[in-house]
Amino acid sequence: MVLPTVAIVGRPNVGKSTLFNRIAGERISIVEDVEGVTRDRIYATGEWLNRQFSLIDTGGIDDVDAPFMEQIKHQAQIAMEEADVIVFVVSGKEGVTDADEYVSKILYRTNTPVILAVNKVDNPEMRNDIYDFYSLGLGDPYPVSSVHGIGTGDVLDAIVENLPVEEAEENDDIIRFSLIGRPNVGKSSLINAILGEDRVIASPVAGTTRDAIDTHFTDADGQEFTMIDTAGMRKSGKIYENTEKYSVMRAMRAIDRSDVVLMVINAEEGIREYDKRIAGFAHEAGKGMIIVVNKWDAIDKDNHTVAKWEADIRDQFQFLTYAPIIFVSALTKQRLNKLPDLIKRISESQNKRIPSAVLNDVIMDAIAINPTPTDKGKRLKIFYATQVSVKPPTFVVFVNEEELMHFSYLRFLENQIRAAFTFEGTPIHLIARKRK
């Protein structure tokens, strides 16, 4: 399901990040907070009144070297392109400023709903001062103290009220995948080469994101695919399009919509920090993964080159031991014909269900190989396990005490399940739960 997007904009020092953190921590529950994947907390997924939405702090995308007005102009432009709802944050302590008026004139031209949040209204006496903000022409101002959590519920109510109608569930028989990677790794060439394969019938269809065009195609076996286009990564003429943080945000949105993510690496440049950050987000989101090394035709090779690359990738992406690696060339089409079948296999792994009886046989065999650990004389007891969901496959292991299930033993059980049932290209989640 594609989540609607809420963007927070405003000049520096009005409390955008504080409001972001207040909303994100207010349960509104954080469903997937990607702090640690991006250096700045610019993106989270939350819920209010049973509606989920993606939350973006556009302040985290600023180019600090750009002129002040250019920075806030870029914020507003990003918000208008990306968001279904915009939260425009101003400061009740400082009143209406020239910068506020500048942003309001930009936002006034958009058809996107704008919610005016007057922050730093930290005591009741200040509420009378918010009426000055009617002059911005953006409707009723909402008094907020993000530091104290006052008024955030009203802002959230307004956000939910203005979110678009929920879309129908997408066809689960269609496999959705995206190609993610830094600029110049050859994503566009790969897309064109994949769609140029003789066994692929392609047609562009309107995407569900604001400006993306997804491509729907069917392979020779009749399997339908949707290739999710990270359009913003390739658009030209926009200064902020080239910033890494903006690219990260675009990649995150594509990952959210994907069943399988193809992490594209440039063989000429090797692995960069950006690659690991984006791959980490896809892993945490439970997506199927393929590591695609492109431009394989462009480097010198010997009998050891593949082995060296595989060893380096496994070392750099230690959390992606399950992800297959494929070396391709968009230029010569080397191994591109293998990608659709590989994507299909990983999608099957994502949707695989294991009968409880068979699963518990594997668990019991694992315990026989490596007995459960003890802590302070008390031994972990595993009663039974069951699979509770797919995409990714998720298992609950019922135990006597959750605290006795050490991370290393949970990882051991995961490895035993993988050895028994393969699960190619997909993370699997194991959760220890006390039996009631």
UniProtKB/Swiss-Prot annotation:
GTP 2 binds at residues 181-188, 229-233, 294-297. Keywords: GTP-binding, Nucleotide-binding, Repeat, Ribosome biogenesis. The gene is der. GO terms for biological process: ribosome biogenesis. SUPFAM superfamilies: P-loop containing nucleoside triphosphate hydrolases. The keyword Signal does not apply. GTPase that plays an essential role in the late steps of ribosome biogenesis. The keyword Isomerase does not apply. It comes from Streptococcus pyogenes serotype M3 (strain ATCC BAA-595 / MGAS315). GTP 1 binds at residues 10-17, 57-61, 119-122. Belongs to the TRAFAC class TrmE-Era-EngA-EngB-Septin-like GTPase superfamily. EngA (Der) GTPase family. Pfam families: KH_dom-like (PF14714), MMR_HSR1 (PF01926). This is GTPase Der. GO terms for molecular function: GTP binding; ribosome binding. Residues 4-167, 175-351 form the EngA-type G domain.
